[in-house]
């Protein structure tokens, strides 16, 4: 009996070790966001707090699951939970094909993909600015020719469904440029591009504040800043506490249009600096930011639209 117990113990150890080896060699799981936006929550529960959102076309890694929830890591990068219905899981070959395909970005605030090239047709899904879709057509790279019909362009959704969008509402998408810490003037954003970013931010004016929001349906402070840059090909980190490390530090008395301005508590008495808010400087002492809603405020206390937390301005960065 003792001998049998020893043999059984050895067998169980072998099976356990084999299982661990297989788990260690498991291929990473990837998916593409298939809805106009997905809600990424702290825990796999609808009552859990919203952390952020990810837009259609983004590639994410699946690292866990619980029932119909999937724990993912997004490109922001951000780790959180979303429902499986918002994802289209792909194997290695499918993902490579997706990444190499010709794509477009939806550049209007809101819209739809239609079954046929008509606004009277049945909708397939909704869209928000920043959504990325594959183009249907022939050829590769600069020789690619999308399928069009009148003022419409044919697109392929992550789900595999084909549909039509208004051609004026999309532009070719060739990827994003990330802004790192202290890049200096060599890779800085041009004045022309910065004016486009500011104009994009103004498209959100009046949009309600939403904690974790990253779409024209609702944005938080860093969501507004990030979305305005993303729509113009610039990829910033998700949160204000991360953005403050991008670009170059700027003196608060030398602000220029397009600088990121940060509010919070300065480092004091051994406590580290705490960043609680970010906005986009637009000149003449004014900022556009998301606080209760996307609005324009002055940092001059003598102005009628004075931002009540202007005294908490702690830093600025130029990208």
Which residues does each PLM region occupy?
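Aromatic- and glycine-rich peptidoglycan recognition patches
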Residues: 111, 119-123, 184-187, 274-277, ...
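Catalytic cysteine-centered active-site loop
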Residues: 208-257
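Short, basic/aromatic beta-hairpin or loop at an interaction surface
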Residues: 29-40, 100-113, 229-241
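Beta-loop motif signature
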Residues: 33-62, 106-143, 209
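SH3/SH3-like beta-barrel fold
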Residues: 57, 70-74, 130, 153-157, ...
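Bacterial Sec-dependent N-terminal signal peptides
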Residues: 1-27
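Second-shell loop/turn segments in exported
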Residues: 120, 183-188, 208-216, 268
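Boundary regions of SH3-family modules and the immediately adjacent low-complexity/disordered segments
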Residues: 20-28, 45, 61, 74-105, ...
